[in-house]
Amino acid sequence: VETGPSLYYEEIKKSLNDINVDIKKIKNVLVTHIHLDHSGGAWKFAKNGASIYVHPKGAPHLISPEKLISSASMIYGNDMDRLWGKVEKINSEKVISVSNNEIIKIGNFEFKALYTPGHANHHIAWQFEKNIFTGDVAGAKIGNGPVMPACPPPDIDLKKWEESLILLEKQ
């Protein structure tokens, strides 16, 4: 679940090598949303053959990331490469759109897509058994600090965010 920015790819590769896992054997990546800190490295996994699972509203931006890159560049300017690294398009055959409550089977594991808009209108939380990978919808915890709301993007919808938190609480 998640790739982080493309800058993290080599670190992920090294960590997997440390446990004798070849990064090229990863064939499925679930992303909560398309913001670069969560899926900016998805293209590298897709180049290795992985399928990338994402909300239908996010899929076009992984296939053609020009608008995403332009938007992020307006915020981060000259720091784009330093913060997020390179972003490339993903072949449409590797981008799989998923619906709310859809079950994705990967080997013997099942992940349930929970549509959780608010932080982003294409946000999905991924439920695995009793655990939920919440992306940014449930906030962020840095170190030993409290859980805080994630940095809000310009298109935040507070009402939908609250509804998403209630949905997660009921799971």
What are the language-model segments listed below?
Residues V1-G4, K27-I34, Y53-H55, T116-G118, ...:
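Active-site neighborhood of phospho(di)ester-bond hydrolases with catalytic His/Asp-centered motifs
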Residues V1-K25, W126-T134:
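Conserved beta-strand hairpin/beta-sheet module of binuclear metal-dependent hydrolase folds
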Residues P5-S6, E110-K112, N121-Q171:
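Metallo-beta-lactamase
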Residues Y9, D18-S99, I103:
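Active-site HxH/HxHxD metal-binding segment of metal-dependent hydrolases
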Residues K13, N17, W43-A46, E162, ...:
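A structural alpha-helix within SAM-dependent methyltransferase catalytic domains
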Residues S39, L62, Y76, T116, ...:
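Long, contiguous hydrophobic alpha-helical segments, chiefly transmembrane helices and signal peptides
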Residues P56-G58, N101, P117, K130, ...:
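Short, flexible active-site-adjacent loop segments at beta-strand->alpha-helix junctions, enriched
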Residues V98, I104-N121:
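Charge-patterned, long linear interaction tracts outside catalytic cores
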